């Protein structure tokens, strides 16, 4: 059950799904919305699937409702950012978020990706370019350091994600509590709407503890992950 004063939002795979959930907030990410959440968090920051192509096709089939966040992969080796943003804008996309993101990754995996150019800063650069092009932007964050970087950009909203799950229940609880605290800090410091990704692996620790006013980003029925 969502905390009193919090609001439901939805991760969706099509603009039609976003329309069906309207006026609730939605994040449109066709590829990640259909994957297991544990796989998608790690794999979708890599060009293993055409994240941006599926987003472009979804917007072409039906423009997403105004206010829907369109999840753009910043680390797309096959498209120029400017061309992609222009294409999305022409298809009725008005709001961009760096999703999927390397933000929740850590340790050796994060270090290897950063060495290959898959950096959080690159995602912030994408958002900066999108905002210069007239888009509203939202920034995904997982740590306080990332929140500071995101706030310097001045996004229209912050999306807090709990990161990768673990089999250790105590560690999941610690991460869940840290995520709630980060959402509260983002809300206080940004002065803008904050969304919290309710990753199924952390639902037991996040449900009922979300700060009032935060949008809880849930998985739409029929979708298994993000």
Please give the residue ranges for each predicted region.
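Catalytic cores of alpha/beta
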Residues: 14-22, 79-90, 144-154, 189-214
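Hydrophobic alpha-helical segments and helix pairs
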Residues: 65-109
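Histidine/lysine/aspartate-rich catalytic loop segments that bind and position anionic ligands
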Residues: 99-169
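Conserved N-terminal beta1-alpha1 strand-loop-helix module at the mouth
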Residues: 1-67, 90, 152-154
